[in-house]
């Protein structure tokens, strides 16, 4: 269908994998470079495993957005740095957030928090603070086009309530929110 988004796995990307594909079914054993070029020309997102395919498929369920400026909202610094690297390598921008609005947001967070982007509201951050940060990114930070929210559970905040806040904000925010939930296995009522 015209306009649909497609993700695909093409196995046999390594030399050994290509040999294995040839021995099983020769039709699949095309040069990896050719497959990459074909996928790129056709707008197909290449995935290298089932988990990645499922993740990309999930991302496709979110609305398309214009722009390249992403706010990363987190209570865990390490994952935010890794996401910053990954998004930057993919051609997206993680613009520095500063000025009066940023200073104002910082006063609403616990000491030690950072709002420069990534916005890190610490492991002790609350669901209410998460909601406030999302509101600022949605309505006060004009240079932001979308948000990635990383929220897991270091055991210091009620995760169920944080996920409820995140779900509500995803329904009402004007800018898209992409959740990254490393602790969904423990997301039930505490």
Language model: regions and residue ranges:
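Hydrophobic, well-structured modules enriched for small/aliphatic residues and gly/pro motifs
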Residues: 1-5, 46
């Amino acid at each position: 269908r015209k306009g649909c988004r497609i993700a695909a796995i093409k196995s046999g990307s390594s030399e050994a994998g290509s040999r294995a594909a040839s021995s099983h079914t020769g039709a699949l054993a095309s040069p990896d470079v050719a497959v990459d070029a074909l996928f790129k020309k056709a707008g197909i997102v290449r995935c290298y495993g089932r988990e990645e395919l499922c993740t990309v498929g999930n991302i496709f369920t979110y609305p398309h957005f214009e722009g390249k400026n992403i706010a990363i909202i987190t209570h865990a610094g390490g994952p935010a740095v890794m996401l910053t690297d990954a998004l930057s390598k993919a051609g997206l921008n993680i613009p520095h957030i500063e000025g009066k609005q940023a200073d104002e947001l910082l006063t609403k967070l616990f000491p030690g928090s950072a709002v420069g982007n990534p916005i890190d509201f610490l492991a002790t951050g609350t669901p209410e603070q998460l909601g406030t940060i999302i509101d600022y990114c949605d309505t006060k930070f004009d240079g932001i086009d979308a948000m990635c929210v990383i929220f897991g559970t270091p055991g210091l905040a009620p995760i169920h309530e944080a996920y409820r806040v995140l779900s509500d904000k995803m329904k009402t925010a004007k800018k898209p929110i992409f959740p990254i939930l490393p602790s969904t296995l423990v997301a039930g009522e505490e």
